[in-house]
Amino acid sequence: MGQAAAITMPIDPRNLNTLWSSVLAESFVRLGLQTVVICPGSRSAPLAIAFAEHPEIDAIPILDERSAGFFALGRAKASHRPVALICSSGTAGANFYPAVIEAKESGVPLLVITADRPPELRQCHAGQAIDQLRLFGSYALWEAELALPVLDLGLLRYLRQTAQQAWQQALRGGPVHLNQPLREPLAPIADPATQTWLAQQWPGENFFAELLTAVPTPQIQQPLPPLPSQGLITVGPIAPEDPAAFVQAIAQLSAHLGWPVLSDAVTPLRQFADHCPRLISSYDLILRQPHWRASLQPEAVLQIGELPTSKELRLWLTEQTCPRWIVSPRPENFDPLHGSSHHLPVTVEAIAIPATIAPASDYSRQWQQAETAVQAAIAQHLAQVPDLTEPGIARLLSQHLPAQTPIFVANSTPIRDLEWFWLANDQRRSLYCSRGANGIDGTLSTAIGIAHQNRPSVLITGDLSLLHDSNGFLQRSQLQGHLTVVLIDNSGGGIFELLPIRDCGPSFEPFVATPQTVDFAALCQAYGVDYQAIATEAELIKAIQTLPTSGIRVLHLFTDRRQNAAWRRALFAELAAIPSQS
């Protein structure tokens, strides 16, 4: 055999494990990998070194695997491309599970690589060895146990092609899992046998020439089904890669059909309101008024993606008998109402929309009149309550945060206040929320992942969500960018004050509301995070109109959850009593 090609790429020749791991890293880089989050460990050392030392990878070390998983989730949400996670063997990978679940449920691409003990050290109490096969159950879109590293060109080709398969599966939108068993030596100790084999056998650049990057499959234009004139479009939580194209498609659809658009707060539509004149943002509150609830019944519904967060809307749709067309390229069932639904397996941008524009109908005008009346009632109500109510905070943020700001919204009360009180605007902000599994875990870490290498970003969160993931502050030194945390501290779970459980008796406060006694100023100081207590609306506006460019800052706002719940209930009662002619 002739002389092998020179090694001119990031292939580590020191020993078998470094060679194998660097081939895996280089394969993923060629496929498009840019970011990897690495958790510390010994068994994963060959993988960590290969990915961390690759010149084209942004490698981020994070101590806590749970926090790391959510950071990767946030980075993948913002970049719309797979982010890799690497950890050691044992329970380390299990800590990725909550983020993997959220990634699966919300269609976010993650590439999870867990190091493992070799087969002979499993099921024999060798230590730090658990069953890592199917570690994530049904939540991995695809998974594989990789072969033990071997000096064999055929097996290196297998490794390269398995990497390509994993990447293509992740691009479907969700997590994939590769489990990599490794034998000693785990340190990059030089092995002459590996170097000799490489000198004789390595094919050089030709090895990666066979690696094919994913080619986007062109979507076939989907014609609209026959639809009546009295219908509506709902848009659930979504952060599309091209917000302007997404908004344009829905605006064209609305114009052609003459239908109103009921958009969740976490979509681009409320940030591009000037593009969508039939946008309805206060539908949850409109449907609390009995006359509107009865008179606004549609003859058909186009549901874009998931249903909006609003429970009121979902209950109302359950009462309808009309067909509902669900537009989503994902194959899951997006009908939790179990109604007369039909799946259109495309993106909304792929719908063939005729150029004709429908005139405004009485039905559409009714929705617009209701929207105007409700927004006026909200403004009047907020003018009568003190500074820094939770509804007022949501409204102020929608009015005063800089244009194009990326915003991550915590679950529980914050996302509902955005749904009710966030003003539609034309500020082109990007809103995100973990509405796959709807948990509060990983809130801070996900927000930091979104802020990394991004515009100065904002997290809107309650105290419990922040405390649940306070380890995320450890990522402060890794963050390339800035995150402002708007901390709405109402000393417990404010959402439960709006639910019947609030009347359960003495168990409510300690076991449901679960107030915590934490000095947030001291907590921020311990992590080296900037802290500012906010006491007035004027202070909040001044603090958010211009955002810093680096580091993490907490703006601490104190609210009373019982008073805020009472104000919301009073507003809901006012809206239910609005005269029907409004």
Curated annotation (Swiss-Prot):
What cystine pairs are annotated? Answer: none
Q: In which pathway does it act?
A: Quinol/quinone metabolism; 1,4-dihydroxy-2-naphthoate biosynthesis; 1,4-dihydroxy-2-naphthoate from chorismate: step 2/7; Cofactor biosynthesis; phylloquinone biosynthesis
- Tell me a GO biological process for this protein: menaquinone biosynthetic process
Superkingdom field: Bacteria
Under catalytic activity, the entry for this protein gives: isochorismate + 2-oxoglutarate + H(+) = 5-enolpyruvoyl-6-hydroxy-2-succinyl-cyclohex-3-ene-1-carboxylate + CO2
List the keywords (alphabetical): Magnesium, Manganese, Metal-binding, Thiamine pyrophosphate, Transferase
Q: Extract the InterPro entries matched here.
A: MenaQ_synth_MenD, MenD_middle, THDP-binding, Thiamin_PyroP_enz_TPP-bd_dom, TPP_enzyme_TPP-bd
MF GO annotations = 2-succinyl-5-enolpyruvyl-6-hydroxy-3-cyclohexene-1-carboxylic-acid synthase activity; magnesium ion binding; manganese ion binding; thiamine pyrophosphate binding
* Database matches in Pfam families: TPP_enzyme_C, TPP_enzyme_M_2, TPP_enzyme_N
Instruction: Give the note describing cofactor binding and stoichiometry.
Output: Binds 1 thiamine pyrophosphate per subunit.
Cofactors that this protein relies on: Mg(2+); Mn(2+); thiamine diphosphate
Report the EC number(s), separated by commas if there are several. Answer: 2.2.1.9
Family recorded in the similarity comment:
Belongs to the TPP enzyme family. MenD subfamily.
Alphabetized PANTHER family for the sequence: 2-SUCCINYL-5-ENOLPYRUVYL-6-HYDROXY-3-CYCLOHEXENE-1-CARBOXYLATE SYNTHASE (PTHR42916), PROTEIN PHYLLO, CHLOROPLASTIC (PTHR42916:SF1)
Assembly information from the UniProt record: Homodimer.
Q: What does this protein do?
A: Catalyzes the thiamine diphosphate-dependent decarboxylation of 2-oxoglutarate and the subsequent addition of the resulting succinic semialdehyde-thiamine pyrophosphate anion to isochorismate to yield 2-succinyl-5-enolpyruvyl-6-hydroxy-3-cyclohexene-1-carboxylate (SEPHCHC).
**Name of the protein in its database record:** 2-succinyl-5-enolpyruvyl-6-hydroxy-3-cyclohexene-1-carboxylate synthase
Species annotation: Synechococcus elongatus (strain ATCC 33912 / PCC 7942 / FACHB-805)
Species lineage: Bacteria, Bacillati, Cyanobacteriota, Cyanophyceae, Synechococcales
Gene responsible for this protein: menD
